[in-house]
Amino acid sequence: MTQPLRRAAGSLLVVGLAGPELTGLERAWLRLVRPGGIILFKRNIAEPTQTRALLTEATGLAAPHALRCVDVEGGTVNRLRDALAPLPSAQAVAAAARTLGRPALGREHGDLIGRAVRAFGFNSTLAPVLDLALPEAAEVMGSRTAGSTPQEVSAYVREFLAGLASQKIAACGKHFPGLGGAAGDTHLLTPSIARSYEQLWSSDIVPYRELHRALPMIMINHAAYPATFSGATPASASPFWITKVLRQRIGYRGLIFSDDLEMGGILKFMSIEEAAVTTIRAGMDLIEICHSPELILRGYEALLAEAERSAAFRKLLLDRARTAAHKRKRLSAQSESRPLTQKQMSALRERILRFNDTIAAASGAQTAKNTTSPVEVS
């Protein structure tokens, strides 16, 4: 197996780590795999200096220009909550923007999240959520969605992306082609969304159609859409959704990112080996394996084994790695940052808390308005 092929296979992986410091075992497999990205979770993040040191060491063992990713959407998905401050959810910010007639609140949300993730040494956040707040997914998605219509979602996301870009942080829109109709959680199973392609194209997919040029990365979900050409196959393994719809029909040119391949939404459908190969073959640029070193290594070895078996896959792997490396380089070059002083961190925390107060006050105003509004009976 040639060294360029090993480097190519590893560079298509975005991997997670066990704790706040690298272990000897992690250093060994990072040197072997040389992944294209590192993603950190709450278990990895204690405070800014420690997090920056962890990212510096891990990316030093990874592929050149490796992504440094974290999930900070606000609300329930905020890996920096304990280390910095809580942030309001997309739902709360979007609702406040509509209530107060201040769409720029979405931009401030993105700006603050951008400042926060930069302060900890990241160059990308896996946000915003572009899913619609439909009744089917209310229990699963909760406050992560900005609105129930494409117009509401696009209005918030457009502002959020501008704020994030002002801090030179790469966004990742998710979860294409839409989880608004998902009654189940893709962490646990493969939800079956019974919406037709026409319904999805004219509703769930509209924010992607409108905003794809502003999204450096888009994440594909693990739900199935049996009423479309993809049948029972999860979207993350479907060339129909990744290549035909997102790449060709919408014309997306950024990085296409899988949701975590350790999720039940795909691992209950296929093995980690099959998932790694199938998602890359379907058109994925980067695949996430976020927790288990064993599964990371199995996914990596599966890509190499398939490349050795198939000349066509070997060419695909090398081409995909070359293209993804170019895009990663462009993103990482935009996001170099210096550590904040303790005084600057305190000022950022205070600014976030003031923003929280603004959103909470708007929520109270909306509640009062709803309480005093006349009730129509139909």
Where do the model's predicted regions map?
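Divalent metal-dependent hydrolysis catalytic cores, especially in the metallo-beta-lactamase
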Residues: 37-43, 123-129, 283-287
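Catalytic domains of carbohydrate-active enzymes, especially glycoside hydrolases
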Residues: 28-41, 112-114, 119-124
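Glycine-rich, aromatic-flanked loop segments that form ligand/cofactor-binding clefts
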Residues: 59-88, 106-133, 153-177
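Preference for extracellular/luminal or secreted protein segments
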Residues: 1-36, 239, 248, 267-378
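N-terminal small/glycine-rich loop or linker at the start of catalytic domains
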Residues: 1-12, 73-95, 132-142, 172-192, ...
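Second-shell residues forming the walls of enzyme active-site clefts
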Residues: 16, 22, 43-61, 66, ...
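Divalent metal-coordination and catalytic microenvironments
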Residues: 4, 38, 71, 117, ...
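Glycine-rich anion/phosphate-binding loops
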Residues: 46-53, 97-115, 147-156, 198-201
